[in-house]
């Protein structure tokens, strides 16, 4: 009898790769294969709660006071399996919440706390997140008690808030509304590095690639020891801090407040060499049950814990709010030292041992700082702010409270998504505030407006183009953009190159809106798109009514941070066959990125491209991809003609030309975005559905459904109602 493990799939040599999902994958053969699958992630098939679950309703029924009371009790309920430093879990819960939210970046709105992604790879195993798994596990009894009444995403942030409150800090408020996902966000680009803490993301003189907002793979922001090329240099570190925090929408004052406020509490952990630390969460053995980084150094916990390898405690009261961070920062001169793990840090010169250790029997130690802490003293701009906070602790507390709220709510979207009794009343400019609706047009008003729009002399393509330009700025990542607010008429959107072709149409619609006085311009723009589609369908011999839900409002310039909105400008919009410039990234990849931000599925992407090409809303007015003899009519001709084997395609510079195989006559021109629907096997399969003889009716109905979805992506007020 043999005990050798056998492969159940072959009966021959054991091989784990023979198992389900193993073996050579498509991506191994074709590493540049288009990731159409990313449009279908987070489907109902992965959601255990089902499509009928209403998180808003579930959270609103929670006993919020009881939940917070349970969290307060947890803060000092130290567990033997992972004891609390200084007898209080608050500092590690602040780190947990910060690192959940701190992955957000403005470039594409991805990352952040809004989806509970810290539970999944790669975030759950990042080097910067060592031992945060313990914090989430400490929370499990509370999450188990309240179940789906509060999401993990909300609980992580609320726990950080309660941690601050139990340590004597007054927070700015808290809003729930983050719904959990059940698998990793595989669409997020975290970098190309293949080893943790590598940094191949820079070019030239330290130009960080967009949309990244961290200096190394596996870090939230910056290396606390300083840049990899300048360890121990606070000024070099300050440059990294300024860039990474700016890419998370933080200015200098917010940056100083966040770093100092966070480092008022707790400590870092570097009691011994990293060689004692085991595998991360994803690589840990089965019996570890989702806990990583098991340590063989001493007890592996408490005073023996190892996380970053740095061993720094900033203040005399690490479990209580104070101004000691700034007092210590400026009181002492600082000299470099190595932590017990060998990491570079700083210790106060000639200081007394006034800093407590993490356990009651720990000896006191001298004040210590990170290189990035010293940046707040030695960078001239940061120093000015730091000294003001040193002299005015109340200003520091106010700045930290607001910056913490912004950090933890930046990707939650507009206030209409906020839930709970602690939502601040104040409107903040970064929330992209909207005025309250004062009038909702009646059905008669809408009918009158539709008639005026139809009689305006504007073509179907012009009407559809302006509505698309307004609505397609939406990003499902951070819930910004969209048609509500009609910000297409304000800076910076009115000045974007991609929007110049719709300027005349917009001006005409503004005239109609002012003359009517019965609807917002935001509603009129979307309604114009509906009219355009109905006209295009009529031109194709079909009578339809595009669903329209009024209630949008018009934002003012004072409610619009032009600089903040600049990141929403599309560098490419394949739906309009637009690219601002030539990129190393193929156009079809940029198209999928845009589609994913619009929360479109692959079928929705496909049908929208076909319909918008038939109507012809190309930003430059070209005929690329307009594979029809009746442009402006809502036909499925794009698919029929793209799939026609009588056409032979040839590259011609940046475009492609389609020739009749028999006559050699040039019939069409198209871009990579157009031709990918015949080239990519998945997209071609979808195109065949809409290009079939029985696909015309399906094409129109699915196009209208996808169109209405895009127009309503930012109508969070409807869900709230």
Curated annotation (Swiss-Prot):
This is Catalase-peroxidase. Heme b binds at residue 263. It catalyses: H2O2 + AH2 = A + 2 H2O; 2 H2O2 = O2 + 2 H2O. Keywords: Heme, Hydrogen peroxide, Iron, Metal-binding, Oxidoreductase, Peroxidase, Signal. Residues 1-15 form the signal peptide. Its cofactor is heme b. Formation of the three residue Trp-Tyr-Met cross-link is important for the catalase, but not the peroxidase activity of the enzyme. InterPro entries: Catalase_peroxidase, Haem_peroxidase, Haem_peroxidase_sf, Peroxidases_AS, Peroxidases_heam-ligand_BS. PROSITE patterns: PEROXIDASE_1, PEROXIDASE_2, PEROXIDASE_4. One of its GO terms (molecular function) is metal ion binding. The active site is at residue 99. The keyword Heme applies. Homodimer or homotetramer. The keyword Ribosomal protein does not apply. The record marks 95 as: Transition state stabilizer. Bifunctional enzyme with both catalase and broad-spectrum peroxidase activity. GO terms for cellular component: cytosol. There is a cross-link at residues 98-221 (Tryptophyl-tyrosyl-methioninium (Trp-Tyr) (with M-248)). Belongs to the peroxidase family. Peroxidase/catalase subfamily. One of its GO terms (biological process) is cellular response to hydrogen peroxide. There is a cross-link at residues 221-248 (Tryptophyl-tyrosyl-methioninium (Tyr-Met) (with W-98)). HAMAP family: Catal_peroxid (MF_01961). Binds 1 heme b (iron(II)-protoporphyrin IX) group per dimer. Pfam families: peroxidase. Its EC number is 1.11.1.21. It is an enzyme of class 1 (oxidoreductase).
């Amino acid at each position: 009898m043999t005990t050798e493990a056998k492969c159940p799939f072959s009966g021959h040599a054991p091989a784990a790769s023979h198992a389900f999902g193993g073996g050579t994958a498509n991506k191994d053969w074709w590493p540049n294969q288009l990731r159409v699958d990313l449009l279908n992630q987070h489907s109902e098939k992965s959601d255990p709660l089902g499509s009928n679950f209403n998180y808003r309703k579930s959270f609103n029924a929670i006993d919020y006071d009881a939940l917070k009371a349970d969290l307060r009790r947890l803060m000092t309920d130290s567990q033997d399996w992972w004891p609390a430093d200084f007898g209080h879990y608050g500092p590690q819960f602040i780190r947990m919440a910060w690192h959940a939210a701190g992955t957000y970046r403005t470039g594409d709105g991805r990352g952040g706390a809004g989806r509970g992604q810290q539970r999944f790879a790669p975030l759950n195993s990042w080097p910067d997140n060592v031992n945060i798994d313990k914090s989430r596990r400490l929370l499990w009894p509370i999450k188990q008690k309240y179940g789906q009444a509060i999401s993990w995403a909300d609980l992580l942030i609320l726990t950080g808030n309660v941690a601050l409150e139990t340590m004597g800090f007054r927070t700015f408020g808290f809003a729930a509304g983050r719904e959990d996902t059940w698998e990793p966000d595989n669409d997020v680009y975290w970098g190309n590095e293949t080893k943790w803490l590598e940094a191949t993301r820079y070019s030239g003189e330290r130009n960080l690639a967009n949309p990244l907002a961290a200096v190394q793979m596996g870090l939230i922001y910056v290396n606390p020891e300083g840049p990899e090329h300048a360890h121990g240099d606070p000024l070099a570190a300050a440059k990294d801090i300024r860039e990474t925090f700016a890419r998370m929408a933080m200015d200098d004052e917010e940056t100083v407040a966040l770093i100092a406020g966070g480092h008022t509490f707790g400590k870092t952990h570097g009691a011994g060499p990293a060689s004692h630390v085991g595998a991360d969460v994803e690589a840990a053995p089965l019996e570890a049950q989702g806990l990583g980084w098991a340590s063989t150094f001493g007890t592996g916990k408490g005073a023996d814990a190892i996380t970053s390898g740095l061993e720094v405690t900033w203040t005399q009261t690490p479990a209580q709010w104070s101004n000691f961070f700034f007092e210590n920062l400026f009181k002492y001169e600082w000299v470099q030292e190595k932590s017990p793990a060998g990491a570079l840090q700083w210790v106060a010169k000639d200081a007394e041992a006034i800093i407590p250790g993490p356990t009651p029997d720990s000896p006191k130690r001298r004040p210590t700082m990170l290189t990035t802490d010293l940046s707040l003293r030695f960078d001239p701009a940061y120093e000015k702010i730091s000294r003001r906070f040193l002299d005015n602790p109340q200003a520091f507390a106010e700045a930290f409270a607001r910056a913490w709220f912004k950090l933890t709510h930046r990707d939650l979207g507009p206030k209409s998504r906020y839930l709970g009794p602690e939502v601040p009343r104040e409107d903040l400019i970064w929330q992209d505030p909207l005025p309250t609706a004062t009038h909702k047009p009646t059905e008669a008003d809408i009918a009158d407006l539709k008639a005026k729009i139809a009689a305006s002399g504007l073509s179907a393509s012009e009407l559809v183009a302006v509505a698309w330009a307004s609505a397609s700025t939406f990003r499902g990542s951070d819930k910004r953009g969209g048609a509500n607010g009609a910000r297409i008429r304000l800076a910076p959107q009115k000045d974007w190159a991609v929007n110049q072709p719709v300027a005349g149409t917009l001006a005409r619609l503004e005239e109609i809106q002012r003359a009517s006085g019965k609807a917002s311009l935001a509603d009129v723009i979307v309604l114009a798109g509906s009219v355009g589609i109905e006209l295009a369908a009529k031109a194709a011999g079909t009578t339809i009514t595009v669903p329209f839900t009024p209630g949008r409002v018009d934002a003012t310039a004072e409610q619009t941070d032009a600089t903040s909105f600049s990141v929403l400008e599309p560098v490419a919009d394949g739906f309009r066959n637009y690219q601002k410039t030539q990129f190393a990234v193929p156009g079809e990849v940029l198209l999928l990125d845009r589609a994913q931000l619009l929360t479109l599925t692959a079928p929705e992407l496909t049908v929208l491209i076909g319909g918008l090409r038939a109507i012809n809303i190309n930003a430059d007015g070209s005929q690329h991809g307009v594979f029809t003899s009746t442009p402006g009519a809502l036909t499925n001709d794009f698919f029929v003609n793209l799939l026609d084997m009588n056409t032979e395609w040839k590259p011609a510079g940046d475009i492609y030309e389609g020739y009749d195989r028999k006559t050699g006559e040039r019939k069409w021109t198209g871009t990579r975005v157009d031709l990918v629907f015949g080239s990519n096997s998945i997209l071609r399969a979808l195109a065949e559905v809409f290009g079939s003889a029985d696909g015309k009716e399906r094409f129109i109905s699915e196009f209208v459904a996808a169109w209405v979805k895009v127009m309503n992506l930012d109508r969070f007020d409807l869900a709230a109602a």
